[in-house]
Amino acid sequence: MGKENCTTVAEFILLGLSDVPELRVCLFLLFLLIYGVTLLANLGMTALIQVSSRLHTPVYFFLSHLSFVDFCYSSIIVPKMLANIFNKDKAISFLGCMVQFYLFCTCGVTEVFLLAVMAYDRFVAICNPLLYMVTMSQKLRVELTSCCYFCGTVCSLIHSSLALRILFYRSNVINHFFCDLPPLLSLACSDVTVNETLLFLVATLNESVTIMIILTSYLLILTTILKIHSAESRHKAFSTCASHLTAITVSHGTILYIYCRPSSGNSGDVDKVATVFYTVVIPMLNPLIYSLRNKDVNKALRKVMGSKIHS
């Protein structure tokens, strides 16, 4: 690419999901509804866990952090996406774009590791119930959660610092609904081989480590479940694990598709639709999947609602 076609940029233009005028209202209402449910479910779950002593256990400690990350995850992307649906000026400043990517990457990597930690927590709870509270001590819970946030922050700093070194772009139009790294790299004039290689390697390493932890945990859980004599208890355990694995599969599957392909620079329409699942849909589904059929959560919610009504 000739230097005459390259320039520094003060802002980027986000094309969004679709430029079809007839779809604007439908898309706006759909994503507004999803965002509303996401806020209500995740903030509600976090608040319920804090106020209910019944839920002061390791599994809900991790779930409260997952809900917090999902709330942040969604809030980083969806409000700007909703505003751009009707805005003629779909601009975002260069700094705003970099900040959005940094926060998005931090939350994304943190969530991936949190899901692995939660799978390990389920393994300890089901396979070693008598030692569960001793094994998953307050100290270990804090250390594991801190490690998740640390990994997210480090990965984000690596990618963001390298992205900030790109000075010239051949265009400022991003074919996406938020500032993600692959479409940004596709616009760069300079050599971004290091960026693309690191993105591929870091994403692949994170996915490999966390998927290995998750699969190992659930295989051991499955082995334990098969030894349960009660058909009802076995069915309950299977259904719970199946719902958890569904959420994990969708989340990890889309991440593998988007980021674990060498030189996946151009963000086409298929990539954007795939990205919607783990940036918009999964943050809404996670609190529902992890608590919908949970008796402890339902009892705690009824108790809190009952006390509010009678107060």
From Swiss-Prot:
The keyword Membrane applies. GO terms for biological process: G protein-coupled receptor signaling pathway; sensory perception of smell. Residues 47-54, 121-139, 218-237, 293-311 are cytoplasmic. GO terms for cellular component: plasma membrane. Disulfide bonds join 97-189. It is found in: Cell membrane. It comes from the Eukaryota. Keywords: Cell membrane, Disulfide bond, G-protein coupled receptor, Glycoprotein, Membrane, Olfaction, Receptor, Sensory transduction, Transducer, Transmembrane, Transmembrane helix. Residues 1-25, 76-99, 161-196, 259-271 are extracellular. The keyword Transferase does not apply. Odorant receptor. This is Olfactory receptor 5L2. It comes from Homo sapiens. The gene is OR5L2.
